[in-house]
Design a protein with these regions (language model features):
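Active-site helix of classical SDR
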Residues: 154, 191, 199
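Alpha-helical segment proximal to the catalytic Tyr-Lys
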Residues: 159, 204-208, 270
Length: 286
């Protein structure tokens, strides 16, 4: 069917209008929406990777952020990036295995910002080894960081959040390896599986106590972070094998997880507690 010149012009105008609308709408989506405006967050392991991405995004969306890490140099860089974009943040040294560090960080949040609303227990390490090859020393090291750190962070965050009485959100980073087993990840599986079920216990405790504190776990697939890069040791073939594990066809990026954390931190998830947010490119759907 041949269109008249007038009809063609009208269609062209409509197409141009839709393109302009979509472009404006895209830019609007990129603008901060204040989803956690006025809230105060602590992010452990916020110097690099997922923790850094979460700290940056929470700050962008209006939260004041305590950057906790053992890596002071990189942690200060995270703070500088946040402040450079007009956000509020400061760094506190945090070894998640140490109870005294946790007490200091919670007190630091309360003294600096007067409250605590959000805790992101992100710090963790990877370790590869079967049940036979893993030493007791390595087993305990993995549990002390990945599981003890989440226990301490949750325990003291509850105490800190309760002080203002308005409730809050605790987000614990588990993994797809907390949902499924891997013969070469005995200690890591145990630690991340522990985070998963500990999160549910904590969520029930807070709900039944009437604290208005939600507790949820996030389960990333393989995300291209320094930790995962270290596992592949810059081996392109190893990276391709990781990519092939994900039906979506690529590895995740730190921001993919940060947006999930933001949702759980915000009031948009006010009916979500004791849940598992799996962000894995289809890995566990197979």
């Amino acid at each position: 069917m041949r269109l008249s010149p007038l009809t063609g012009v009208v269609l062209l105008i409509k197409v141009l209008f839709l393109c302009a609308f979509n472009l404006v709408h895209h830019h609007e989506r990129e603008k901060p929406m204040g989803r956690v405006d006025g809230k105060v967050a602590i992010v452990s392991g916020a110097a690099l990777g997922i923790g850094k991405a979460a700290a940056l995004l929470l700050a962008q969306e209006g939260a004041s952020v305590i950057v906790g890490d053992i890596n002071k140099e990189e942690g200060q860089k995270t703070v500088s990036e946040i402040e450079g974009k007009g956000g509020k943040a400061f760094f506190l040294l945090l070894d998640v295995r140490k109870e005294e560090d946790w007490k200091s960080v919670i007190e630091g949040a309360l003294s600096r910002f007067g409250r605590l609303d959000i805790m992101v227990n992100n710090a963790g390490i990877a370790y590869s080894g079967s049940v036979e090859s893993t030493t007791l020393e390595d087993w305990r090291r993995v549990q002390s960081i990945n599981l003890d750190g989440v226990f301490l962070g949750t325990k003291y965050a509850i105490e800190g959040i309760r002080q203002h009485g308005a409730g809050g959100s605790i987000i614990n980073l588990s993994s797809i390896e907390g949902l499924i087993g891997d013969p070469e990840l005995a200690a890591y599986n145990a630690s991340k599986g522990g985070v998963r079920i500990f999160t549910k216990s904590s969520a029930l405790h807070c709900a039944k106590a009437g604290y208005k504190i939600r507790v949820n776990s996030v389960h990333p697939g393989y995300i291209w972070t320094p930790m995962v890069a270290g596992l592949t040791q810059e081996d392109e073939a190893a990276r391709k094998r990781l990519v092939d594990l994900h039906p979506i066809g690529h590895l995740g990026e730190p921001d993919d997880i940060a947006y999930g954390i933001l949702y759980l931190a915000s009031d948009e998830s006010k009916f979500v507690t004791g849940s598992e947010l799996v962000i894995d490119g289809g890995y566990t759907a197979q």
